[in-house]
Amino acid sequence: MPRRGPFLALFAGCVSRGASRSPPGHTLTRRPMDPVFLQIGNFTIAWYGVLMMLGIAAGYWLGLKLARERGLNADLFERMILWMLFWGFVGARLVFVLTSWHIFEGIPFPRVLLDIVNLRNGGISIHGGLIGGVLTLIYFARRYRLNFYQYADLAVPGVAFGIIGGRLGNIMNGTDTVGRVTGWPIGYHWPASARAFHEGMCRPNPNPDMDLSKYCHEVGGQIMMTAPVHFTQLYGVIIGIILAVASYFWLKSRVPGWAFWQFWLWYSILRAGWEETFRLNPLTIKTYLNQGLDAPGIGLWTDTQIFSVPLILVSLWMLWRLRQRRQVTVPTVPVQSQS
């Protein structure tokens, strides 16, 4: 495969995302909040793909810049980034399929295989993408006998920018990462122009905890989900911005691995404690659920929240080890007594 083959494959998968939601001849002026960025005939470019790739491109450029400044092998790191993107995307889709198998149950073989690889209706997991990227980096570090953490640290800003772009794309898609119904003042009413959101949320959901169709009414000749919800997509954007800003300070430390494990710690805390708490996801271990027009819109525990607990503990332990190692390696200057 050519050097940029993984990048092109990733882009091709992203740009078509959400194409099935928009009819041919669609124009952006008619639907300001539409998944489709551009449509030419049957060729569709989705906002999700455009925004995510812009975020990744920013991180790609910054990572190479940092690699050159630190005297690392920038050409090799560029190859790493491209393959990390490719296998990260594969991991993101694979984890989504495994954790959302109920979507694919009952689909006959071999059609189910086509549905698994079909990204037009969305479905990726950020944690799966991170795992795929980390495994790729481990492979390169072992093959070329590199310090894994020196290169892993440089990928942190790119991941943060990718989160920002992806969550902005989720806003345009409408039906992705939706929040729970809430009576808090922070509740967001989706505009009538966000047809993908209203059409998606007004379809009956077999899971009563996730069924918002009871809040749907006809307004101005259009079906609309009228209840306020947590704007969890925006929460995700803010989390990405926080991580991007924080990575600037984490990378000031020359201790390899410091930025890498700080990212895992704070992404897990913010994602599980903030975004996921208010997000309309299935509750794997249902210990608390309080949602509705007179409720805060909180649910515990989702798959992501459960998975984040060991990640937080491991990250804290690794950061403690790095701090201890740094204290041991700092040379001490002997104090000479004056006679």
Curated annotation (Swiss-Prot):
Top-level class of the enzyme under EC nomenclature: transferase
Protein name per the record: Phosphatidylglycerol--prolipoprotein diacylglyceryl transferase
Similarity comment: Belongs to the Lgt family.
Documented EC number(s): 2.5.1.145
TM annotation in the entry: 43-63, 81-101, 121-141, 231-251, 300-320
Pfam family, one: LGT
GO MF terms held by the record: phosphatidylglycerol-prolipoprotein diacylglyceryl transferase activity
Main location: membrane
Coiled coil (UniProt feature): none
Membrane topology: Multi-pass membrane protein
Subcellular compartments: Cell membrane
UniProt binding sites for a 1,2-diacyl-sn-glycero-3-phospho-(1'-sn-glycerol): 167
InterPro entries referenced in this protein's UniProt entry, alphabetically: Lgt
Keyword entries, A-Z: Cell membrane, Membrane, Transferase, Transmembrane, Transmembrane helix
Recorded GO CC terms: plasma membrane
Functional description taken from the UniProt entry: Catalyzes the transfer of the diacylglyceryl group from phosphatidylglycerol to the sulfhydryl group of the N-terminal cysteine of a prolipoprotein, the first step in the formation of mature lipoproteins.
Pathway where this protein functions: Protein modification; lipoprotein biosynthesis (diacylglyceryl transfer)
Gene Ontology biological process terms in this record: lipoprotein biosynthetic process
